[in-house]
């Protein structure tokens, strides 16, 4: 079981795209420029949302993840930007992969979400 769910791969992770490929899911990004790292004091506790990236701290693009459990090894290493404030029971039920990249054959999909400032 993984400690987080990652999404936002608009190149290989979009099942409506001709580039869709579960073996490559999590390695693609968007055509927009990468984001510079913005590390904060937000701890990567259960429900925290953070930007996914490659080994380069300044490589965050379209992908983000939601932490299922405390992951202090991510603190001040990944740009946390939010937290689930309602519906954590839905997050707890997200399918968890056990493959090399953690993908699942029939991934759960975000149907709708709201942001709050």
Residue ranges and their predicted role:
Residues 1-117:
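Cyclophilin-like peptidyl-prolyl cis-trans isomerases
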């Amino acid at each position: 079981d993984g400690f987080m769910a990652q999404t936002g791969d608009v190149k290989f992770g979009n099942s409506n795209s001709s580039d869709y490929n579960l073996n490559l899911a999590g390695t693609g990004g968007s055509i927009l420029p990468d984001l510079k790292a913005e590390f904060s004091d937000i701890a990567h506790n259960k429900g925290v949302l953070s930007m996914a990236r490659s080994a380069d701290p300044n490589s965050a693009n379209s992908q983000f993840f939601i932490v299922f459990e405390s992951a202090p090894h991510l603190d001040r290493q990944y740009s946390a930007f939010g937290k689930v404030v309602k519906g954590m029971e839905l997050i707890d039920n997200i399918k968890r992969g056990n493959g090399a990249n953690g993908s699942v054959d029939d991934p759960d999909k975000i149907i709708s979400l709201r942001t709050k400032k």
